[in-house]
């Protein structure tokens, strides 16, 4: 909220609000998670001021709720995100993503020789937490990559 307590992005009556997305990550989430493949209204706030983060992105999707799996898959991109369930303009549920064991149907394998590029299969990566990194192992070629390599793909 601004100092005069006005919302910078209009409130929604029912749906999902993904808040505290790192700045410049909102559009990537929209495309990777196919959040725009709906006829419901989507409101996007980019580079909004944030006391905690300096700047943040925000996504509001009316009449749509994320599954627990979708919420947890956000952890790679927005580990500090808050996912709010809204009903009748009130927050009725709040969750934070936690790193899942697998990420399916979202990422693309960076190995150009991987069979997932030539065959009609859904992507699938095992998530492995390392000391200072997160590694992703492709189900098909079994190669392991730093999450930054896969995310840049």
UniProtKB/Swiss-Prot annotation:
Subunit text: Heterododecamer (2C3:3R2) of six catalytic PyrB chains organized as two trimers (C3), and six regulatory PyrI chains organized as three dimers (R2).
Protein name per UniProt: Aspartate carbamoyltransferase regulatory chain
The protein's role, per its UniProt record: Involved in allosteric regulation of aspartate carbamoyltransferase.
Residues annotated for Zn(2+) binding in this entry: 109, 114, 138, 141
Cofactor note: Binds 1 zinc ion per subunit.
Iron found in the keyword field: no
GO molecular function (one): metal ion binding
Keywords: Metal-binding, Pyrimidine biosynthesis, Zinc
Cofactor(s) listed in the protein's UniProt record: Zn(2+)
Alphabetical list of InterPro entries matching this protein: Asp_carbamoyltransf_reg_N, Asp_carbamoylTrfase_reg, Asp_carbamoyltrfase_reg_C, Asp_carbatrfase_reg_C_sf, Asp_carbatrfase_reg_N_sf
Organism: Salmonella typhi
Gene Ontology cellular-component terms listed: aspartate carbamoyltransferase complex
Tagged with keyword Zinc: yes
One of the GO biological process terms: 'de novo' pyrimidine nucleobase biosynthetic process
Recorded family membership: Belongs to the PyrI family.
SUPFAM superfamilies the record matches: Aspartate carbamoyltransferase, Regulatory-chain, C-terminal domain, Aspartate carbamoyltransferase, Regulatory-chain, N-terminal domain
PANTHER family in the cross-refs: ASPARTATE CARBAMOYLTRANSFERASE REGULATORY CHAIN
């Amino acid at each position: 909220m601004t100092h005069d307590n006005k919302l910078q992005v209009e409130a929604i009556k029912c749906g999902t609000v993904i808040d505290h997305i790192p700045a410049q990550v909102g559009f990537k989430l929209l495309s990777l998670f196919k959040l725009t493949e709906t006829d419901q209204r989507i409101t996007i706030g980019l580079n909004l001021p944030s006391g905690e983060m300096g700047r943040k992105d925000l996504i509001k999707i009316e009449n749509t709720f994320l599954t627990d799996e979708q919420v947890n898959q956000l952890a790679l991109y927005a580990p500090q995100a808050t996912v709010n369930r809204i009903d009748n303009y009130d927050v009725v549920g709040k969750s934070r993503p936690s790193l899942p064991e697998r990420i399916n149907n979202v990422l693309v394998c960076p190995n150009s020789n991987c069979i997932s590029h030539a065959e009609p299969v859904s992507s699938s990566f095992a998530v492995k937490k390392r000391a200072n990194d997160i590694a992703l192992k492709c189900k098909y070629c079994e190669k392991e990559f730093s999450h930054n390599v896969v995310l840049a793909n």
